[in-house]
């Protein structure tokens, strides 16, 4: 370890019987290892823990499913709550009301003719339709010259255009086989444009910022915090079409390939008005979603749903799964000048036939033999390059009760008038950016209704504490995700690292859950008398940090610039301090854990809170610790910890947030300031629907009436003073109205992203009594 504590060798015993030199109560000997080794092992252990949670999810799903298989009607009624739950997970937000859909708008101009192409039986138009206020669908419409016998929504992969699936693009006519066949069979066919995987519009031209984020990830980063997602928006567009088609009193089908296949399956699961569904190049079990493009993240998705469960929601309507061609992600390009490379890693796999058959078998077992008759698997013949196998399209036509095909006819294309896909993509992306902007502006109303109104209505301390406890439970379980309480009692290991005339430093590890440990440094002042109990300050490092960073007093060390060795400084003032390791370290190593945990309705802080639960329980067993006076003080990601951990763990008697307090939701979701996380590489940062539930002021309300302080440097680039002041004003007003104005403070200082250690030290002295 390369840091400096002003230590003297452990063998130089100091005079007098002081607690710091005696073995820590109830601990066994901890083997020696470096901080880097301990951290890497802890991250690896938690990764295995998260992987096991994913493996265990399937076996626990039945608790959410109460199926009535006595009849098709009874079955559909029994799964109705699951439809609503799936829609919420996918981002069909209850505040987003679809605009009434009365028809398709034809797009034409002096440049682009009304008819893009025509055949003997149908004509082709560019169209637009409303989905939400300010959010439209656009695509290609193959319209029958006579009355249509059915309507089909044909969804491309995100790497394809509607024109390609309509067979209008020279050299790619084969992609139009399914659309042409359905149109020849008498179907009206609408092919929507999806948000694609290019990055042309992933940035803010007014700020001069461009990123390499796919348009899909670009929208995800703005909307996940607001309870929405790009797939949810696209489902709104599809379901708006379903509403219009269903009113025409003909069968309605949905078919899709790749990303479009995924949307087709989800749409059919959500809307019983879809009569038949074809899913091609999209079936895979959802346990691997953490490896897929970031926008597929769903908080709690696989806790309640696998691919089989989603398919079961389509029954008893026909569902055809085609296994053949699967799309691939485009290869990453070279770095471009002026373009930030901050996209999350991702891949798309081609699942093995055996895995697909296994998933289909499980879906059939879920619904029973009678309903399973409506689920069909089509394996494409070897060498079949069609994205929609001919056999699968045939089964879709049969399910829609479509008659024989007409004889093929020439499709005459007016190539000069095809829509500009790039301009259309810009419109679609900008619409969602603007919708997210509006949602960001109004989400404060939802937080007010959820948190501040109930607290204001609480007229007694008992009612207010009960209200706070209810909100705390919701925050922990629904926003962070709650794991079972740690195993107990805590069994710890420790070793003395070093000592000086003011304190002894112990390294401590303890089991939290099987395979998951908590680890940190305990600094015990040397002046503690037998029987004396001292207050504790838990000193939390930030991103990519180690416990040694907050105890290192060497002013030449890199970490000293931010932390100033504040855990050691406080120990010299007589506080017991503990520097725990939070596992946000290792770049993609810990970020992948976040992706895994999100799938089962958990987050990094689900694990971190468990580690702190166990640490608090262990600290209280030490005879020199005042268990009623354990405070929290964290910088940067440690400041994030200061907002979340004490908010759900009342055993922390106060909290100090340094270098992180913010208009947090805005920092996560806005595209209008360079400091936003949408422009950073920290792709783990977004927390599902937090914008409508708990911003930092609301988290602070969960800490109240315990003391709470903010430490803010004017030059700290994590936020703006104006944002910080706006958010903190709500906190101070709440404390002040409770008659607790002295229990909440903010200190501004001239400085950057660092511990200042002046007003905060006085705050600790005032409330901890030293």
Model feature map: region roles:
Residues 21-137, 144-147, 224-233, 239, ...:
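Alpha/beta-hydrolase-fold serine-hydrolase catalytic core, especially in secreted/extracellular enzymes
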Residues 149-150, 185-188, 250-251, 272-276, ...:
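Loop/turn elements at helix/coil->beta-strand transitions in domains of secreted/extracellular proteins
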């Amino acid at each position: 370890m390369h840091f400096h504590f002003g230590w003297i060798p452990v063998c130089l015993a100091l005079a007098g019987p002081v607690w710091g030199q005696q073995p820590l109560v109830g601990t066994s000997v901890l083997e020696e290892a470096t901080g880097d080794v301990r951290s890497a092992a802890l991250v690896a252990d938690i990764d295995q823990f998260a992987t096991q949670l994913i493996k265990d999810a399937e076996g626990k799903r039945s608790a959410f499913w109460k199926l009535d298989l006595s009849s098709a009607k009874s079955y559909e009624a029994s799964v109705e709550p699951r439809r609503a739950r799936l829609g919420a997970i996918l981002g069909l937000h209850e505040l987003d009301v679809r605009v009434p859909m009365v028809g398709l708008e034809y797009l034409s101009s002096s440049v682009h003719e009304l008819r893009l192409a025509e055949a003997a039986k149908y004509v082709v138009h560019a169209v637009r339709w409303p989905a939400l206020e300010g959010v439209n669908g656009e695509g290609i419409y193959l319209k029958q010259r006579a009355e249509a016998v059915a309507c089909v929504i044909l969804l491309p992969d995100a790497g394809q255009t509607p024109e390609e699936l309509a067979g209008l693009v020279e050299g790619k006519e084969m992609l139009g086989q399914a659309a042409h066949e359905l149109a020849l069979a008498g179907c009206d066919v609408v092919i929507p444009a999806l948000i694609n995987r290019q990055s042309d519009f992933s940035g803010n031209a007014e700020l001069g910022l461009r990123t390499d984020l796919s348009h899909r990830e670009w929208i995800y980063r703005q909307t996940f915090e607001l309870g929405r997602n790009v797939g949810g928006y696209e489902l709104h567009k599809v379901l708006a079409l379903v509403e219009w088609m269903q009113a025409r009193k003909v069968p309605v089908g949905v078919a899709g390939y790749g990303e479009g296949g995924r949307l087709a399956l989800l749409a059919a699961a959500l809307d019983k008005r879809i009569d038949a569904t074809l899913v091609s190049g999209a079936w895979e079990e959802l346990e691997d979603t953490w490896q897929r493009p970031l926008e597929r993240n769903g908080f709690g998705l696989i806790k309640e749903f696998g691919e089989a469960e989603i398919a079961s929601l389509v029954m008893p309507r026909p569902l055809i799964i085609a296994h053949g061609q699967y799309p691939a992600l485009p290869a990453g390009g070279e770095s471009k000048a002026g373009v930030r490379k901050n996209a999350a890693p991702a891949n798309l796999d081609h699942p093995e036939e055996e895995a697909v058959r296994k998933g289909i078998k499980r879906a059939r077992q879920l619904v029973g033999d009678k309903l399973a008759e409506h689920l069909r698997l089509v394996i494409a013949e070897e060498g079949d390059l069609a994205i929609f196998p001919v056999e699968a399209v045939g089964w879709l036509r049969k399910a829609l009760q479509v008659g024989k095909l007409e004889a093929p006819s020439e499709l005459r294309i007016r190539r000069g008038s095809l829509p500009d896909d790039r301009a259309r993509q810009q419109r679609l992306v900008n619409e969602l950016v603007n919708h997210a902007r509006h949602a960001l502006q109004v989400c404060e109303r939802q937080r007010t209704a959820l948190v501040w109104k109930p607290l204001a209505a609480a007229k007694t301390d008992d009612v207010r504490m009960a209200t706070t406890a209810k909100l705390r439970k919701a925050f922990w379980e629904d926003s962070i995700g709650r794991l079972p309480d740690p195993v107990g009692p805590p069994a710890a290991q420790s070793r003395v690292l070093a000592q000086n005339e003011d304190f002894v430093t112990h390294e401590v590890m303890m089991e939290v859950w099987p395979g998951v440990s908590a680890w940190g440094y305990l600094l015990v002042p040397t002046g503690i008398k037998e029987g004396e109990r001292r207050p504790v300050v838990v000193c939390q490092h930030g991103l990519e940090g180690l416990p040694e960073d907050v105890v290192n007093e060497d002013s030449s060390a890199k970490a000293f610039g931010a932390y100033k060795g504040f855990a050691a400084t406080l120990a010299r003032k007589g506080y017991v301090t503990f520097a725990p390791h939070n596992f946000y370290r290792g770049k993609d190593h810990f970020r992948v854990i976040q992706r895994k945990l999100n799938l089962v309705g958990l987050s990094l802080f689900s694990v971190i809170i468990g580690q702190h639960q166990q640490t608090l329980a262990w600290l209280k067993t030490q005879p020199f610790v005042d268990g009623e006076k354990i405070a929290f003080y964290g910088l940067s990601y440690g400041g994030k910890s200061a907002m979340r951990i004490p908010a759900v763990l009342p055993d922390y008697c106060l909290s100090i947030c340094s270098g992180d307090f913010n208009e947090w939701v805005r920092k996560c979701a806005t595209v209008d300031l360079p400091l936003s996380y949408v422009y950073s590489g920290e792709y783990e940062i977004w927390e599902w629907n937090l914008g409508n539930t708990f911003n930092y002021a609301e988290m602070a309300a969960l800490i109240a009436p315990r003391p709470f302080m903010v430490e803010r440097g004017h030059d700290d680039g994590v936020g703006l003073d104006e944002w910080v002041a706006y958010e903190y004003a709500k906190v101070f007003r709440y404390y002040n109205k409770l008659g607790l104005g002295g229990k909440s403070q903010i200190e501004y200082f001239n400085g950057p992203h660092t511990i200042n250690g002046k007003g905060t030290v006085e705050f600790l002295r005032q409330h901890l009594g030293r």
